[in-house]
């Protein structure tokens, strides 16, 4: 059975930095071996949902994860860079907009900085333990998990929300309204922002939302609303609210 009208949110697989040691942010680092395995597990979990269109951030770890997932469906992503789309209207990019002209195994993949991880400012790329020693573990945790404020010279979750959600409304919602199965591969912060918007989570409760690398959340688009499907939460999306 082919499933249609779904939104799949996937956090990228583990990056090459030691897990939990550094705050990656905008550091553009590829997947580790474990990250590749996590992406393969996502591909297996999604084998019954045929992806029609996909979105990723500008950072390579999300794109690697996404293409591994697509390869599990024997599909090839045709990348539409945001700058290309700005210069040439989508309706002129026939083979981007309608990849079935080149075969059903090709689907458009839109990459955008709107889905990037938060910029960590003075914490960017620094060892988490060192930052906790300098600022205090509680303060670092507040910067990372509260809706606002963000770290020194960096983005708060609110700032990420304000760039991620408008993009989602403009680019992703039309595809869902058209009955497409949409895959978004992004980061802890940008996905938390989307989950906050979709599930109408309060500024206070969003602190408890966590997504581990390689985890996913699936929503069904019905009657103009996105309804969560994998409510068991378990390994898919860890929430404690």
Curated annotation (Swiss-Prot):
CDD domains: HP_PGM_like
Transmembrane segments annotated in the record for this chain: none
Active site (UniProt): 12, 117
Record-marked site positions (Transition state stabilizer): 187
One Pfam family per UniProt: His_Phos_1
Catalyses which reaction(s): (2R)-2-phosphoglycerate = (2R)-3-phosphoglycerate
Protein name: 2,3-bisphosphoglycerate-dependent phosphoglycerate mutase
């Amino acid at each position: 059975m082919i499933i249609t009208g779904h939104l799949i949110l996937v956090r990228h697989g583990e990056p090459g930095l030691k897990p939990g040691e550094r705050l990656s942010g905008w550091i553009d680092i590829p997947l580790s071996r474990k990250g590749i395995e996590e992406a393969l597990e996502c591909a297996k979990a999604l084998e019954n949902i045929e992806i029609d269109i996909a979105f990723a951030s500008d950072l390579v770890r999300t794109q690697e994860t996404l293409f591994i997932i697509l390869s599990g469906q024997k599909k090839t992503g045709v990348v539409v860079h945001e700058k290309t789309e700005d210069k040439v209207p989508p309706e002129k990019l026939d083979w981007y907009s309608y990849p079935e002209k080149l075969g059903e195994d090709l689907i458009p993949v839109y990459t955008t900085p709107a889905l990037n991880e938060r910029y960590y400012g003075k914490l960017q790329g620094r060892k988490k333990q060192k930052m906790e020693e300098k600022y205090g573990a509680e303060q670092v945790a507040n910067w990372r998990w509260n809706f606002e404020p963000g770290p020194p010279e960096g983005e708060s979750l609110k700032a990420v929300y304000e760039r991620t959600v408008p993009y989602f409304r403009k680019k992703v919602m039309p595809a869902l309204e058209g009955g497409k199965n949409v895959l978004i591969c992004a980061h802890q912060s940008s996905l938390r922002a989307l989950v906050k918007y979709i599930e109408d989570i309060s500024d206070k409760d969003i602190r408890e939302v966590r997504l581990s690398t390689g985890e996913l959340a699936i929503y069904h688009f019905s009657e103009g609303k996105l309804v969560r499907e994998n409510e068991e939460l378990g390994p898919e999306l860890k929430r404690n609210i």
